[in-house]
Amino acid sequence: GSLKQVPRNRTFISDCLHDVCAGQFGDFDSLHPYLPGATSTTGFNFLYEPLYFYNAYSENSDITPWIAESHIYNAAHTKIEIKIRSGVEWSDGMPWTAHDLVFTVNMLKANAPELLFSVDMDKWVDKAVAVDSLTAHITLKAPNPRFVFSYFTNNFDNGIPIVPKHIWESQDAKTFKNLDVARGWSVVSGPYSMVMSTPEQRFYDVREDWWAAKTGFHALPKVERVIFLPRREESKRVQNMLANDLDICGTLLPANVRTILDHNPNITTWSDKEPPYGYLDWWPVSLGFNNLEEPFNDPEIRWAINHAINRQQLVEIGMQNAGDFTVLPFPDFPVLKKYTDRTEELLQRYPVDSFDREKTAEIMRRKGWAKDEDGFWSKGGERFKIVIDIFAFMMDFTPVLVEQLRQAGFDAGFRSTSDAYTRMSSGHAQAFIFGHGGSVRDPYFTLRLYHSQFVQPTGTPTPYFWRWQNAEFDRIVDEMGKTDPADPELAALFHQALDVWLPNLPAVPLLQFYHRIPHNQTYWKNWPSAENPYINTAYWHKTFMLLLLGLEPAQGRAEQVESS
């Protein structure tokens, strides 16, 4: 069928972030939500609605019940009863029930370890049953007071897509494409359905029969059509924003955001037209190492590298003052600061923020290194090399970091290659810069990234690749995992964990991370901002639907404004 006419001023146009959609959509014939790396977040991330949404940016860090009405744990945090809202429907008119939730959990369990979240479901879930169409019971293998928040509350990249049992039960979950526009697939619960998908573009049109509009739970979005275009290099993204051919694009380097703000008066950011030109993401970055390999397996060497780094200069020169540095691997969200603000005594004993080349030199000499005629640390005729693997979006501050390391005597350099992530995951990257997709509400999730359960030998990929192991740290983190976030004991355990982590310094914290995403107000207004933080604006996150529900048209429907 041919597409209906939708005016530009009722259309929302985005680019795409992932490698799979660089240049064109490599996944144009698929909308599979659980294939690692093979599916771009241009659909499944906002069309499978969650039990709950979480907003780390609102004053109270709100949790909003969506498909769930409520849930309750037993006292031991080993059993959960989940109540489903009545009147929720799939896009083919079938009711959305507890059977869909239970089917999804069991399907993932049965397909471990290949599918995303399958290992987690296999690890945690003893059994999941639907007691009736609106009640699910989940029995866990071990206490987990965060289970519903970790897996069924959409925030950032977190949250398991829940799929319709009546479609998926007859399919092979590992190979099902889940896309056939003529058949009305993908069957989803959200307010849009896919009407076109080609290597060049993806179109979604609003569904007048969305369950939330029918039941009065939420009005239909004003955005009538959503278009995704493939990823282009950053200069092309800038041109398309200036020409109003995009309403939003992937995060940009500070200089490029400035160019856009200077040349298109209709464009703003989360922080309006001021630095940091965006919002704090959940992903503070650190300089990491393959801690299994020499010389980085020595904590003193890691401290020597730490003392060579001037974080203030990384911000001032590298990020053109559009950011903040960090000495801990946690994002500065208000709800986390009640933990990180109480670390002064620890940071006095373990002064991560001490830029001190003399201290670097003292450690290096004690370890048997001496400076050669060019001023680089050498031992047995070999220089101390640090080659740092990075991503293109780190090109602003990395050269500054490398120069600091060189001035302190390390033979440092960096490279940004298309296989950077693979190199990090496998451990072939000896040094790298990466972020922490961890804590957004309490410190457990970030510390868990350093648990030895994720350590794989060099050559074997792992999703969390800090490659450090410490039995005492593991024990404390396991205890944190069983502790309710509301329990004051969690703060004491956090302190104990850092008391092991800091002297070992398995990675060197560098910077808070910002999403510098331009918001084009030519066709759409009521964008989220620091003043109105109803959700963050990363369209690849699993909260993108809330942005689409919040946007308001900037023009009357019939207005035809030249895009210039």
What is each residue range found by the language model?
Residues 12-75, 106, 187:
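N-terminal lobe/hinge region of extracytoplasmic solute-binding protein
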Residues 83, 119-171, 522, 530:
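Surface-exposed binding/hinge segments that line
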